[in-house]
Amino acid sequence: IQTGKYVASPGCHASGFIALVYPLIAAGLLDRGALLTATSLTGYSGGGKKMIAEYEASERSELLKGPMPYALGQSHKHLPEMQKQCGLENAPVFVPVVGNFYSGMLVTLPLHASLLKGAPSSDALRAVYKNPYPLGLVHVSGEAPSALYANAYAGRDDMEIFVSGADGRLLVSALFDNLGKGASGAAIECFNLMRGAPADAGLTLG
């Protein structure tokens, strides 16, 4: 990025997925041929002006009060990016879900420990995630939450990774703002790096 003339920042869903999967592959814990599934819960701002207008209309459908899984035909536009940037041999089964809130995103990757070399503990996974992200914009929580709110990082430009689960059934989750670290915040971060500024210059962090 520092020496690039043109830099493309990743899509919002892809940002969370890549942040969770790539470090596992780079560390040799996850095979590139692994068959993965992921869900991503996003605020309705991710759907652009048309969807924002639908959700904020004075007379809107009652159906919009509930979560809406979409792209069920496995044709989401971020899938090729997710597969390519992680070096996966197979595209994941991906379920994006729009929620009744403006912004925020929670990407979750369920993993059986048997998929990971050596069946690492939750603490070992947290250590893996700490190594690739030295710029201070991706944090790794030391806690194992029993619940996460997808809009908790709305208005922020950083990301937090959580590891939870038990009995060999693990969940790794990326919590961030689809409009921040998932969009404009990531673009500003890249611009900062290209011009030799601190990565977090002008960004809103927790």
Task: Locate the predicted segments by residue.
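Glycine-/Pro-rich loop/turn segments that contact NAD(P) or position catalytic residues
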Residues: 1-37, 42-57
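C-terminal substrate-binding/catalytic lobe of Rossmann-fold NAD(P)-dependent oxidoreductases
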Residues: 34-35, 39, 44-173
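NAD(P)-dependent Rossmann-like dehydrogenase/reductase catalytic/cofactor-binding core
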Residues: 158-206
